[in-house]
Regions:
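Active-site mouth of glycoside hydrolases
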Residues: 1-217
Length: 217
């Protein structure tokens, strides 16, 4: 792994790193936590995760590794930080590293897609190739350890103690999915009861949207 600030070394350090890895016979590295480390100067736009100085250093390191025949395992999303600056209310109270919630929050999903599009279409000035077309990228990871199920059961993520407005948002999404799949409470109880009386409060948290669909439970 090359992680966090290690993804953005100065040119001299990048030269040395590529040389050392090659000397030890390493032919693939994982670029880890690329989008996690916030630059000192901040990001140029509220909805951007690309900062010019970091990007230039990343480009240079990538090119030097490529020159040495070292392939890249490119990790795009891990622990991406969000804050009130990006328009997220109570962001500092969200679960550890925002894992799980960024699978369902529309703005978080939008920002991930935006970042993916920007970085993959970016032409590295040192290689002359866009990352999406560079064959030295052997693997690409869209999201790392980001299962909503894992976050639900992990005490570290505290997903069951979401703050507003995120709690209501995910309840609405969950209830809409249940309604679309089962249509009524009797079918829902049968599917989830497994031969016993299903607890509706646990399966179906109360929400405005489900009440609007006139389902009496």
């Amino acid at each position: 792994n090359i992680g966090m600030t290690g993804c953005f070394p100065d040119h001299a350090s990048a030269d040395k790193l590529a040389e050392e890895l090659s000397r030890y016979g390493i032919n693939i590295v994982r670029m880890h936590y690329v989008s996690h480390r916030t630059p000192k100067e901040g990001y140029p736009f509220f909805d951007s995760f690309i900062e010019p100085v970091q990007l230039e250093r990343f480009d240079y390191l990538f090119a030097k590794l490529k020159e040495k025949g070292i392939h890249i395992y490119f990790q795009l999303n891990i622990a991406r930080k969000v804050s009130w600056v990006n328009g997220f209310v109570n962001a500092h109270l969200l679960p550890y590293y925002k894992n799980g919630i960024d699978n369902v929050n529309e703005r978080m999903v939008y920002l991930q897609k935006k970042f993916h599009g920007e970085i993959l279409n970016h032409i590295n000035p040192y290689t002359g190739i866009a990352y999406k077309d560079d064959t030295s990228i052997s693997m690409m990871e869209l999201a790392n350890e980001n299962s909503i199920v894992h976050s639900w059961f992990s005490p570290k993520h505290k997903f069951t103690a979401l703050v507003e407005p995120y709690k209501s948002e995910i309840i609405e999404i969950w209830n809409d999915w249940l309604f679309d799949k089962y249509g009524d409470m009797e079918t829902l109880r049968t599917a989830w009861g497994k031969g016993t009386e299903a607890n509706a409060d646990e399966i179906l948290p109360k929400s405005k949207n489900f009440k609007k669909k006139n389902i009496d439970w």
